[in-house]
């Protein structure tokens, strides 16, 4: 994952570690390049510069969130950050480095930009039976993702698959909407189940993860995360769709 191409001889292109990426996003200067037009909320492509490095990030300011009837106003950016923390705790590294910080349009989430192939979505990855999708589907179950569109699965230049756009996650009521229902019934690997069991214990146990999530979500949402993880461990399989609102719209 690259931080992006340079625009002068004074900047260098860098492949960054997770820790370095977070420091880069936290301390870097944000220059807004333009709004990403297909996003439903204000989503801005930004150039980040810090200590001779420059790269791209996706900035989602709280003030640009559209009001929703089922998610509290001004919380979507925090859900983006919470999804990253869950991904990291699981050890799956599905979500690009993401953090909350102040920016030119106020506080919001800042996520390292993934230079992905625009022709590859979850539909193409499903057709190729990419192994990362089962973990993404499990991740969506436990985070209760209400908006897993096909375009929210990105194929990076190294073949790695990333999951983005998690502002509509962590609701206490069942809201799972995804294009990954083709994987329903898939038995999850033992290692995946062990990761989920550990996540459930930590989310419910009042330790560092629970504390970090508690700064981003309310207590009921953190408790619901733990319950969903435990339930998925008990069944050991990805669930089937329920009801008539199982798919996001648009699909891509």
Language model feature labels by segment:
Residues 2-27:
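Juxta-kinase regulatory segment immediately upstream of eukaryotic protein kinase catalytic domains
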Residues 156-252:
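C-terminal catalytic region of ATP-dependent kinase domains
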């Amino acid at each position: 994952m690259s931080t992006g191409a340079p625009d002068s001889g004074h900047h260098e292109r860098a492949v960054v570690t997770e820790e370095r990426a977070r420091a880069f996003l936290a301390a870097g200067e944000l220059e807004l390049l333009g709004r990403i037009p297909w996003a439903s909320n204000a989503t801005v492509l930004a150039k980040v510069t810090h200590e001779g490095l420059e790269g791209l990030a996706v900035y989602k300011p709280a003030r640009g969130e559209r009001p929703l009837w089922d998610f509290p106003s001004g919380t979507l950016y925090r859900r983006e950050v919470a999804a990253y923390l869950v991904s990291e705790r699981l050890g799956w590294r599905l979500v690009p480095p993401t953090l909350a910080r102040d920016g030119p349009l106020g506080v919001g989430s800042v996520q390292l930009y993934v230079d992905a192939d625009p022709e590859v979505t979850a539909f193409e990855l499903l057709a190729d039976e990419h192994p990362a999708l089962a973990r993404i589907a499990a991740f969506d179950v436990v985070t209760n993702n209400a908006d897993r569109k096909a375009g929210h699965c990105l194929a990076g230049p190294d073949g790695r698959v990333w999951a983005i756009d998690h502002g509509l996650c962590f609701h206490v009521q069942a809201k799972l909407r995804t294009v990954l229902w083709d994987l329903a019934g898939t038995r999850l690997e033992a290692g995946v189940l062990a990761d989920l069991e550990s996540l459930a214990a930590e989310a419910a146990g009042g330790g560092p993860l629970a504390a970090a999530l508690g700064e981003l979500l309310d207590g009921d949402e953190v408790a619901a995360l733990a319950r969903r993880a435990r339930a998925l461990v008990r069944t050991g399989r990805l669930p089937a769709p329920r009801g008539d609102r199982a798919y996001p719209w648009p699909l891509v």
